[in-house]
Amino acid sequence: XAPQNXMNGL
C-alpha cells in the first residue's frame, strides 16, 4: 500500500 508514517503504523 501507500508508504506509512512510523507513528500511524496501522
Swiss-Prot record:
Protein name per the record: Bacteriocin IB45
Record note on temperature dependence: Optimum temperature is 35 degrees Celsius. Highly thermostable. Retains 60% of its antibacterial activity after heating to 100 degrees Celsius for 3 hrs. Stable during storage at -10 degrees Celsius and loses no activity during storage for 6 months.
Keyword Chaperone: no
GO BP, sorted A to Z: defense response to fungus; defense response to Gram-negative bacterium; defense response to Gram-positive bacterium; killing of cells of another organism
Function, in words: Bacteriocin with a broad antibacterial spectrum against various Gram positive, Gram negative food borne and multidrug resistant pathogens, and against some fungal pathogenic strains. Displays bacteriocidal activity against L.monocytogenes ATCC 7644 (MIC=80 ug/ml), and inhibits the growth of M.luteus KIBGE-IB20 (MIC=160 ug/ml), P.aeruginosa ATCC 27,853 (MIC=80 ug/ml), S.aureus KIBGE-IB23 (MIC=160 ug/ml), B.cereus ATCC 11,778 (MIC=80 ug/ml), E.coli ATCC 8739 (MIC=80 ug/ml), E.faecalis ATCC 29,212 (MIC=40 ug/ml), A.terreus KIBGE-IB-35 (MIC=40 ug/ml) and A.flavus KIBGE-IB34 (MIC=20 ug/ml).
Keywords assigned by UniProt, alphabetized: Antibiotic, Antimicrobial, Fungicide
Activity-pH dependence: Optimum pH is 6.5. Retains 70% of its antibacterial activity at pH 8.0 and pH 5.5.
